[in-house]
Amino acid sequence: MSRFSAVGVLLICLVSACSDGANDQRTYVLTTGTTGGTFYPVGVALSTLVSARAEEGFSLTAISSAGSMENIKLLRDNQAQFGLILGTFAAWAYDGVGPISTPQPHIRSISAMWPNVEHFVLRSDLVIDGTVSDLAKLKGERYSIGMRNSGAEHTGLYIFDALGVDYTEDLSIAYLGYGPSTNALQDGNIVGMNVPAGPPVTAIARAYALLGEGMTILEFSEEEMAAINQQFPLWDFYELLPGTYPRQDKPVTTAYSSNVFVVRDDVSEEVVYNMTKLLWDNLATLQEIHSATKSMVIEAALKGIPVPLHKGALRYYKENGVEIPEHLLGG
């Protein structure tokens, strides 16, 4: 049994043990991601924390999904009331831009979660300056952007547009998942791949182990960071320290955006306040469940959030002395 499977069984047992006598509570749905990703085990852990505290007056059921795009739809249709989504998708959904053409004004933020780190990989013999703008100089090469309709595809193409990478004319785009991208890079079927995720990423670790100096993670310059933040200030610099991956002996300055915990605006202030309090009061428990959450600190709870806070979350942060950016007010 895998580690996550074992954790899942344990959490389900805990939920069952704590569910007696709670049938009169309002049950909310938290939509997460695929069972093999990070959103799902963290979502299950959150639902377990709620269920273990019947005095909160509500319960939370975590469900798996295809990820951020489906989560937006489930929130829109009120089939889910809470969700974990990429920060880019939160911005697109709220304003109705990019791949989400209709504004979703009902979405509110609870907290930034762990970082979603950009890994734009390129075969080393094609590297010129060592930054992501090198991708604009490729002509006719095959590059993997991620699976179709995935967060990797949409955020990758958004960054390409911001940096002037003509992926329709200059590149031959491949739509491969992370593992298949590593295989294709090793086999010479692609020259690079886009892998946004919380490090260390298994696919990147495998690529380093297989190719070593034959592959490079491209860096972001100040100018490139300004370009991708021009419409939505979502990204910041992230340093991959030496040793993050095997055979990586130098630091890499890349970019990250936050994954965001969101909620519908019609969920009561009291419920969202209690959910926010529960999240931060039990952070150590979440960090035992999944290592991605170990980077979470309340001082960065609002960093990279593009959508106004729910009133319940706003009340919690005010009570705890967290400085609140103006664009997050008015939720």
Question: Can you name each region flagged by the protein language model?
Answer:
Residues A197-E219, N229, E270-G331:
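An extracytoplasmic/periplasmic, membrane-proximal ligand-sensing/linker region
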Residues Q25-R53, F58-T61, N116-D187, E299, ...:
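Bilobed "Venus flytrap"/periplasmic-binding protein-like clamshell domains
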Residues N71-W114:
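N-terminal segment of the mature folded domain
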Residues L14-A17:
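C-terminal motif of bacterial Sec signal peptides marking the signal peptidase cleavage site
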Residues S19-G21:
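Bacterial signal peptide processing site
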Residues G87-F89, V97-G98, S109, S124-V127, ...:
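Pocket-lining segment of extracytoplasmic ligand-binding domains
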